[in-house]
Amino acid sequence: MTAVVRLSIAPVRSLGLEHPDEIDLTPLGVVEDRRFYLVDELGRLVDRLVVGRLVQVAAHTDPGGETLRLAFPDGSVVEGTVSLGDAIETALHGRTAVGHLVLGPWADALEAIAGRRVRLVRTDQPGGTRQGNPASLVSRSSVAELARHAGVEAVDARRFRMLIELDGSAPHEEDAWVGRRIAVGDAILRVTERDARCAITTQDPDSGQRDLDTLRTIIAYRGLMPDATGAPKAMFGVLAAVEQPGRVRPGDRVEVLAG
């Protein structure tokens, strides 16, 4: 039986993951997921491709994005009610995110770990920084298969920052779900495509240091596969659209539906 074993969200894009006991999936994804993100002084996205150690900061927000708590690796905490400043548009991997600058102490606190001037943004539309299909899934058996080909004892699935982590399926069985509908908890998803991976997966999910060439290994045993535009990519896990909103919890079964 294939079932959900872990849920992961990032209230601030590229910062540490949270593992909630349940999520409410909407057509835009999970409203708390990637609700905030960082930009530089020119309004350009600052993520873990730029500063890997951002992952060392833990973040928490409420569904409305009205409060924000950041916990830093030195034990310090910055938290409070979110106040918004000027509107801002940000280029996010071929899309444009619309949001407002966040006033208050968070950006200054993040500068120390980022090593550069950054500004914090709250997106105007929950789920607005997700790439098209807001639900992402990967199985533990797929991650174990990657570890086998990489010649390491284990690979931490958090490298892939997937919303839904599964167990009980064969390695890369989720690939066969592309074009199919699946029931996950109370939600129904349509799996639309494999997930094209980037260099963030080469970073340790706790430190942000590059320590494993995941992309080379994926390409070596799976080859390059075309993305939605036909460009060859290293694919790992799948993306899905939310056809029926619903609640998802660890332990929920995953069922491939007819039609």
Set out the residue ranges of the language-model regions.
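Metal-cofactor-dependent catalytic cores
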Residues: M1-G259
